[in-house]
Amino acid sequence: MKTYIQLLLVALFLPLLSACDQEDDVIDIFTGKTWYMTYIAVEGQNKMYDFWQNDQDAREKSFKTITGDNYTLVFEGANVNDVAIGTFSGKATSTSVNGDWSANGDNRELKITIKNGGGTDGDKYLGKAFMDGLKSAFKYGGDNKNLYIYYKEGQTVKFISFAPQRNSGN
């Protein structure tokens, strides 16, 4: 009976000992996959922002650029002193970019420093927004199945939504 009670106490307290850490596993979120853009929206919304201001032809032309390795990001890095740091590379439509990144799992702060590329993209709507978003990124959200990079455009906070590209490791 005494052994039964001891086992019961261990079973009851085991979840407390292995409680989930609220800090993100930032390396698991960012690395090991190619992220492709799924949409760009205003924070709190989940529909594509209307960069085209109801110009359906321009919208359709932009959406045709969402193919192949366009609008993709690849992060490499390691965890150093509880902050993930590393390098990244990406591509809009005609513009490639690479540089350094760091992310803090405690407060979800994201810093992206572009070292090469990042100029004007061939698509003046989605391509421009993609590059602007990387340049002014300040936080992230998501997990290893969805990544949201938040950026400010004036007083408006927008985010770029990403999903892992098929056959990219996840």
Could you say what each language-model-derived stretch is?
Residues M1-K2, D21:
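N-terminal hydrophobic targeting signals that begin at the initiator methionine
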Residues C20-N170:
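Lipid interaction determinants
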Residues K2-V10:
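Sec-dependent signal peptide recognition
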Residues P15-A19:
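C-terminal motif of bacterial Sec signal peptides marking the signal peptidase cleavage site
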